Amino acid sequence: MRLAILIGLGGFALAACATAPTSVGGETVARPASSPFERDRDAILAMAGTFKVTFDFIETAALDADYEPKERKVSGGYEIVKVIEDRGDFISLQHILYVGGEDKFPLKHWRQDWQHEPNRVLTFIGGNAWTLEDVTARDRRGAWSQEVYQVDDSPRYGAVGRWTYDNGIPAWQPAQAWRPLPRRDMTTRDDYHAVDAVNRHAITPKGWLHEQDNTKLVLSSGEPEALVREVAINTYARTNEVDNAEVDTHWEATKAFWAGVRDVWKTFQNEGEPFALTLKGEPGDLYMPILGLASQIEDGEMSSEAALKEAREIIATYTTLDLPPLTERLR
């Protein structure tokens, strides 16, 4: 039942902080709470909590003579964002959906990892493939990378930017970067291959916003060709309408498994070489079995250790370091 609902989530793209230590040159240094570093941390941690979410996407301008913009897509639901790791200069936020009509239940969603002054950043290069790009000393100074991961902890995209506080609003915006198709399009259309996105996060009195200025790209010729512009705004408003105890129970039952799955994916990033999925388009054959393993753990049908062994085999089946040309990786 839970996995069937996930397939239908096209619209979902299927805290106050004390002074924290961080590592500088091998030494642990305590930074004052008033430092720019701590102010940035507070902004990132403000994205954790329980939210009522609205996803609003509208194609605004056709950039191809034969294309007609699609109808606006608006959806919503509830989302819990948990801090699952905080090392001072690294913060990991796990999103969990709360779905299912009257009988709602929690379901693991996407994850965002924030690294202060990163040396490298995960970069999507099209056709379900990624590489690690070096970040120059100038670009990393005072900056944070955000790397975003799928429901099965496989990669989606990453970028580097600085938090700003103009007009009293904490906001983060990186340079324009590619990302894979969102699930709302990946499962319903096949006329483009990547999104060239300007991505903004802003903290508001009631929660936070995720704004996007997207250009949908066709890559069939090997060179990007713009199809249409899209504007998106995802609104996260704090709410007390969710049974957080149920969400906590769900996460406690599966968190060891997901920590192991994250470690498997980290091996690719640690290698520093380009890597890809062997699947074209929507990688359901990868993420559905892994989500199924998590459900079996939660239902008491399988241990985390046994499930992780199977997850490693699934990931190995659908990943490669031997990348074919871009046009051969497209569906």
Q: What are the residue ranges of the model-derived segments?
A:
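N-terminal intrinsically disordered, cationic/polar leader segments
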Residues: 64, 86-126
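N-terminal helix-cap/turn-to-beta initiation motif at the start of protein domains
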Residues: 34-50
